[in-house]
């Protein structure tokens, strides 16, 4: 129901009222789900959830008034392509998928798992080249780590929509943020192929098949699906939560940086797996134990995205060494962290006269080759690494935009060592980034390796004037106390 103020005041935004469906014969899950949504909407915030307005007493007149988000549901948008018998453009799939991952990540940062993600619960407020505002709806099956899980206490069974429910939810496990990543994978699969990976099962046995069944590869349905996109989708659909993306931010990162996705056997499949492969997987699934992450926000912090800002000019080997050492320390204390190595070049660099005989691709390759050489000294086992060259005339703003757009958790960059006397009046790039970054920033001072320090001291001693031998002999051999 649309809502307005009784006294005629103009509302700050369109409002809508939601009331629980309580017909004769309906189960108690309707009112329990309504109570969960009423509880969560009052504590959730951000652009990806409807704004809460008011709520009625559950024991008298239960209702919920919230922002009326204008737009189209993802389900209706997908149906428009199905009715026209046209495939959804891959660019739109990737863009909407990244926007959905961003919205889900915002939810996880507030310690909430949606647990009922499906196209009907995703509102696309705007569609265009500049991006979309994705708003998540219907939090009746959601779980907040700081509140009692009313659904888990009330029902001892799988709770969720059969088509999109994650394997761990099938066995009654709630509260793992990677369950939402599985649901995003189902949505991406459906957008790319027009089919659902596991059908729409109605029995417990049908639901449990996703614990071991590998879906038909998207490229078997649609030949123009690139390998990297299939890799992303099938990683989301892994039955073991530990083999999926550790957070929605990591999923969004890959969708926005397709050139950095490491394609494995998953991405190259064009046929489904055979009987014996599924039989072995079924045997493993029989004894599978699911261990959810303790808190969604803690899971995000434990497997962060680390960004290293590497200068591309006016930098010494000592500074690069110090930057590499700081990166090694950060990765050493963060197993599984994703590393993004970033540099910013001037807008006119690729078109300047000094590079007129070089292509932009060649110059990009030169920078990327330098990055990989710099990273040779790092232990990158267990870490996904990507390299990025950003073109901009404002280095600080480019780094900040990258960090915000990719949900970076930690920025490592060199501290300015020249012009120190002027830093009180003019903010340097590191200071600007540290002041406005959406995450922690580590500024690294120059430091030399111990071996080079020893060599430097030896050189200094060699250059020092040596005392005259006769003068030394004339000095007393001992001094009075």
Model region roles, listed by residue range:
Residues 100-112:
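Protein kinase catalytic-loop region centered on the HRD/HxD motif
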Residues 59-73, 77:
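Conserved short submotifs of the Hanks-type protein kinase catalytic core
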Residues 413-436, 450-452:
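Glycine-rich, Arg-bearing micro-motifs that act as flexible, cationic patches
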């Amino acid at each position: 129901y649309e809502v307005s103020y009784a006294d005629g005041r103009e509302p700050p935004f369109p409002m809508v009222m939601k009331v629980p469906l309580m017909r004769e014969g309906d189960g108690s899950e309707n009112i329990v789900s309504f109570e969960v949504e009423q509880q969560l909407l009052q504590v959730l915030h951000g652009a990806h959830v409807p704004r809460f307005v008011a709520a009625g007493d559950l024991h008298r007149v239960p209702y919920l008034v919230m922002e009326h988000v204008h737009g189209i549901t993802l389900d209706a948008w997908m149906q428009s392509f199905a009715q026209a018998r046209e495939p959804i453009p891959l660019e739109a799939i990737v863009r909407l998928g990244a926007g959905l991952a961003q919205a889900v990540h915002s939810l996880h940062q507030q310690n909430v798992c949606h647990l009922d993600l499906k196209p009907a619960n995703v509102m696309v407020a705007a569609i265009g080249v500049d991006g979309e505002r994705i708003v998540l709806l219907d939090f009746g099956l959601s779980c907040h780590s700081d509140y009692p899980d009313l659904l888990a206490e009330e029902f001892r069974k799988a709770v969720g929509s059969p088509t999109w429910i994650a394997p761990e939810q099938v066995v009654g496990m709630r509260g793992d943020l990677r369950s939402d990543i599985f649901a995003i994978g189902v949505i991406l699969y459906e957008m790319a192929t027009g089919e659902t990976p596991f059908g729409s099962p109605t029995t417990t046995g049908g639901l449990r098949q996703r614990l071991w069944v590998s879906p038909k590869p998207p490229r078997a349905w649609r030949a123009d699906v690139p390998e990297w996109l299939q890799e992303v989708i099938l990683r989301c659909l892994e039955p073991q939560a530990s083999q999926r993306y550790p957070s929605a931010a990591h999923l969004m990162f890959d969708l926005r940086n397709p050139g950095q996705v490491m394609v494995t056997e998953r991405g190259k499949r064009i046929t489904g797996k055979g009987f014996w492969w599924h039989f072995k997987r079924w045997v493993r699934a029989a004894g599978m134990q699911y261990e959810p992450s303790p808190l969604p926000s803690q899971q995000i912090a434990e497997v962060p995205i680390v960004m290293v800002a590497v200068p591309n000019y006016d930098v010494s080997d000592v500074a690069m060494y110090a930057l590499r050492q700081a990166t090694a320390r950060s990765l050493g204390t963060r197993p599984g962290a994703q590393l993004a190595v970033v540099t910013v070049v001037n807008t006119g660099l690729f078109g300047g006269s000094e590079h007129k005989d070089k292509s932009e691709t060649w110059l990009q390759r030169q920078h990327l080759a330098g990055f990989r050489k710099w990273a040779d000294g790092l232990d990158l086992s267990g870490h996904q690494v990507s390299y990025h060259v950003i073109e901009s005339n404002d280095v600080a703003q480019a780094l900040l935009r990258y960090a915000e757009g990719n949900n970076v958790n930690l920025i490592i960059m060199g501290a300015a060592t020249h012009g120190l006397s002027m830093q009180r009046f003019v903010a340097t790039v590191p200071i600007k980034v540290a002041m406005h970054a959406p995450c922690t920033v580590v500024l690294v001072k120059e430091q030399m390796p111990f071996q080079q320090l020893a060599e430097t001291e030896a050189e200094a001693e060699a250059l020092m004037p040596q005392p005259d031998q006769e003068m030394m002999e004339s000095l007393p051999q001992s001094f009075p106390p």
